[in-house]
Amino acid sequence: MKKIIFILLLFLANPIVKGQIADRFTCMTTIGTGISMNTPSTTPFAWQVTGHYKLSERFSAGIGTGLSVYEKALIPLFADARFQLTKPRRVVPYLQCGIGYAFAPDEDANGGFFFHPSAGVQYKMHGKTTLLLSIGYEIQNLERLKKYESSHYAAEFREKLHHNLISIKLGVML
């Protein structure tokens, strides 16, 4: 009988423990640009939406997508992890890392590997709204089809690009 009561208490305690972390799901959107670290130099524009699930008070993981524009438009799909360096308060520094693959909707391009570690700070505003500012390093691989035509000949080749850049992003988390 004692074993049955103990097992029932364990099952009843589980919802109590999970109830201690408020708002387990968060959604964030960011826009950003970067400083290219290689040639050919391209200043990208990036917009991302990420959904996170809080695994603890300071660590969350989720998935994201968005739109990145380099020479061609890319749609990244990535896994994302985020760790807050201090306990939750008005201003909190954090580390974040996204890794995945970017797809190219254009038939003249192929996407590639995507990796984006960053460090940032979040500032809690009214209610659940939080502002985000981050600086990171982004790696984006891309393959595009280049065509050249003149009156004498026509050429077509695939060019593999490896973008490495320092990224700056501003966003909102709800």
Give the label of every model feature segment:
Residues T130-L132, G136-I139, L145-S150:
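A contiguous, mid-protein "functional segment" used to position or interact
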Residues M1-F25, L170, L174:
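Bacterial Sec-dependent N-terminal signal peptides
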Residues C27-T29, V49-G51, Y137, N164:
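Polar/charged side chains located within well-ordered beta-strands of beta-rich proteins
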Residues Q20-T29, S36-T43:
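Outer-membrane beta-barrel initiation region
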Residues N38, Y70, F103-N110, L142-E149, ...:
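Extracellular/periplasm-exposed beta-strand and loop segments of Gram-negative cell-envelope proteins
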Residues A81, K160-L174:
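Outer-membrane beta-barrel "beta-signal"
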Residues T30-S36, G66-S68, Q84, G98-A102, ...:
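Outer-membrane beta-barrel pore domains and translocons
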Residues S41, F45-L131:
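Gram-negative (and chloroplast) outer-membrane scaffold detector with strong preference
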